[in-house]
Amino acid sequence: DAPVILHNLPDILDINNQIRLLQDVGVSIQRTSPHDIILQANAVDTQYLQSDEFLQRCGKLRGSVMLMGPLLARFGQAMIARPGGDNIGRRRLDTHFLGLEKLGGKILYDSQRQVFSISAKKLQGTYMLLDEASITGTANILMAAVLAEGTTTIYNAACEPYIQQLCH
């Protein structure tokens, strides 16, 4: 529920679409400069998160996968459409799913709707070894793990500076 301040956001379509998606979910976003924003997520509309409109928008934005960890941690469930968006080669979602499962998430895929559902009664910290040092996979797992009970240790985690910043 605490405000989050993000600095140096590029003014690009994917970032702006992700901001609009967060606003539609109920996140209050205040732009403090052309590249800085303050986010306040104390009025998230959990019903909207299950709507066809939300799922359609997720399907058009690869970055929507980054909502899974935080939504699972805060609300015990998340749904996203199979992410589309850019076409920059093969980027698997396995790391995201395997890490969230290790924390206690149960993942289902509806092939007809192309929707992933994940739920957990309680997330539990654990040791995990990632098959690949995925930047977004590591970030998603970290964002879920902060609200898990116990300690989470991730081996073969991505170690880019922004991942290190996320840890602080």
Task: Label each region the model flagged.
Residues D1-H168:
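Structural preference for solvent-exposed beta-strand-turn elements
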